[in-house]
Amino acid sequence: MPADRLDGWLGRFESRHGAVRGSRQDEALTLTAADGAVARVHLPCAPSQSDRNDLVAAAAAFGSFGLVLVRRGGFAVGRVEQGSLKASRCGTRYVQGKTKAGGWSQQRFARRRANQADAVAQAAAGAVSAVLGRIATTLVCGGDRTLLRQTLELSGADGWPVVRWLDVPDPRRQVLIDAIPRARAARIDLNSAARSLGS
């Protein structure tokens, strides 16, 4: 659910199901309505309180973060400020597919594939340093988790908080732009009572 539509959705949930009581559980805010309907709202940054106004404010406030997308076919790194892409760097790299050859050929191809994947991580790490700098920032990451961990380690960003993981196709600039609203969106899980009335 886009962050700017969350307030309206919460209002409709309450009007359909009755008064709502909020409670924090893990990284989500659980909203329990009078009729037993339950909605678990997951945001990239958890609200400090458990009421509707704070939830909406927390969703709207998450607008500045680093976006790091890495897959074997390339990488895209962006700095997002107030919900807009302010700086980015993208690149593609060739990583050979798996082979069905056996013996020495298989080992040679595996080494070549590993070296090519390392080159992707090195290039992506350079982009992280260039675009995001050295000051720790909140990150949203997407793609191949092994390559992402390697990229963050190489760039010195492995200690930075990662608040969300996205599934993405091969990273390009447009994929980076399309990932911004997904990174900021609220994820809502409903129980059967909430789904039965089409919340």
Predicted regions and their residues:
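Terminal alpha-helical anchor/extension segments at protein ends
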Residues: 1-199
